[in-house]
């Protein structure tokens, strides 16, 4: 059995790490490189960086900080933000990123997933999915351009259908960003994760809702996700990564202990 992964998420805007609630009202957390170094030292298995306004601004992720991060950490990291071409991806990988993640650009041009996978290998192609639960219809819908409130829109894709589609096109991993739960720290959407797990045959990463160590345990134990991504509980030092891993190990979760 592969070890489960603990993944701090760093949302980046204007060269700073920020954090919002349900993708809104972002506050500045701090500088990118020191935070990345801290999480690596605490025992994170990998890091994910989202340049949250790159796609909505029509630009690619700011590459200036990518190489600086690569210089100070020795764990894998993934970068996302406005990657719309093979050239964009090649540059980011050349600066030291281990994976690239696409979200809104994949919705705009699903063939991008296949082209990236063919060029760089499925192992480094992650598809992020921003999913919103509509209580009126009881359905999960994929959203696009979520980094800019004025441009955010609901797509025609239902989440489960899009999960299946991106796998067919070559996604090597899926990060499910559950927007309803984002930043509120009341637990991952286990019901949605279980439904996605049934149709997801590549590594699945849960994102949105972690508030306690038990929430991580539930995601691993009840929804069988491969990794759990979180931001605010780590940024605000509510949960220490080393202590979280020790707790999960006592609960029988296969986890890498530093």
Swiss-Prot record:
Catalyzed reactions: 5-[(5-phospho-1-deoxy-D-ribulos-1-ylimino)methylamino]-1-(5-phospho-beta-D-ribosyl)imidazole-4-carboxamide + L-glutamine = D-erythro-1-(imidazol-4-yl)glycerol 3-phosphate + 5-amino-1-(5-phospho-beta-D-ribosyl)imidazole-4-carboxamide + L-glutamate + H(+)
Q: Which UniProt keywords apply?
A: Amino-acid biosynthesis, Cytoplasm, Histidine biosynthesis, Lyase
Give GO BP annotations, semicolon-separated. L-histidine biosynthetic process
Residues the record marks as active site: 11, 130
Which domain of life, per UniProt? Bacteria
Q: Which GO terms describe its molecular function?
A: imidazoleglycerol-phosphate synthase activity; lyase activity
**What functional role does this protein have?**
IGPS catalyzes the conversion of PRFAR and glutamine to IGP, AICAR and glutamate. The HisF subunit catalyzes the cyclization activity that produces IGP and AICAR from PRFAR using the ammonia provided by the HisH subunit.
Q: Can you say what this protein is called?
A: Imidazole glycerol phosphate synthase subunit HisF
Q: Which organism is it from?
A: Escherichia coli O1:K1 / APEC
